[in-house]
């Protein structure tokens, strides 16, 4: 890990721990070497920081292309391993760059909802990102962010103090999905993320949302669905 990246990581850890009371669980589920695809739900602009600050490896992630317009900010996010993606299109250049970095043995973070949640729930996922995992043969680690929607909903200009949880789930290894289509793999990962979120909301009932349809929940979680 580069010294400058390590410093930024340390700074983010301190700020998020104090202001957002951010806690990370399951970091050991991220393999220590080799290409890894982190698949996270998307609650706020801070999600790339929250999902990578606890890792002992540098994270790589897509960022909206309009964030690269300012040369100073561009230098910063490129140093932090961001690369541009055009939203609303099948950006082949971004897909190829993701695959290149995964094949180099890096950690790549993606938010397959494509946009921030409007209500805190995990929305439909885009299957194209799961096709990347199938083509590169890397493990997928589902990552849940919970509490950032309450701290920084879409209509709010700046984040409020919060109580944020980041959980890294058990990896989905290639042997578990090589026979699945990208759509089936997408649904498997989404259901895991929903189950992770549901478990935290059972422990922290003040966060409980209007829940998902019963057919969206794993069987053991149906008691919390509408």
Give a label for each model feature.
Residues 17-25, 149-150:
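Short gly/ser/thr-rich secondary-structure transition/capping motifs
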Residues 22-24, 82, 140, 166:
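Generic structural signal for residues in well-ordered beta-strands
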Residues 27, 41, 64, 88, ...:
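Generic beta-structure capping elements
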Residues 23-33:
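Membrane-interface helix-loop junction between the first two transmembrane segments
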Residues 4, 8-10, 17-18, 31-89, ...:
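Catalytic core of membrane glycerolipid acyltransferases/transacylases, capturing the structured
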């Amino acid at each position: 890990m580069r010294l400058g990246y390590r410093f930024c990581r340390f700074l983010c850890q301190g700020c998020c721990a104090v202001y957002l009371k951010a806690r990370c669980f399951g970091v050991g589920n991220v393999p220590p070497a080799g290409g890894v695809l982190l698949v996270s739900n998307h609650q706020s602009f801070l999600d790339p920081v929250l999902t990578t600050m606890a890792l002992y490896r540098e994270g790589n992630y897509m960022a909206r292309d309009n964030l690269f317009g300012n040369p100073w900010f561009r230098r910063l996010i490129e140093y932090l391993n961001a690369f541009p993606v055009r939203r609303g299109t099948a950006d082949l250049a971004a897909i190829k760059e993701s695959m290149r970095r995964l094949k180099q043995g890096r950690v790549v973070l993606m938010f397959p909802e494509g946009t921030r949640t409007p209500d805190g729930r995990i929305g439909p996922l885009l299957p194209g990102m799961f096709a990347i995992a199938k083509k590169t043969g890397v493990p997928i680690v589902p990552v849940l962010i919970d509490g950032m929607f309450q701290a920084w909903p879409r209509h709010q200009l700046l984040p409020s103090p919060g109580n944020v949880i980041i959980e890294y789930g058990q990896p989905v290894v290639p042997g578990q999905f090589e026979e699945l289509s990208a759509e089936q793999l997408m649904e498997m990962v989404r259901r895991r993320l929903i189950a992770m979120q549901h478990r935290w909301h059972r422990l922290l009932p003040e966060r409980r949302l209007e829940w998902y349809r019963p057919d969206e929940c794993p069987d053991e979680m149906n008691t919390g669905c509408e």
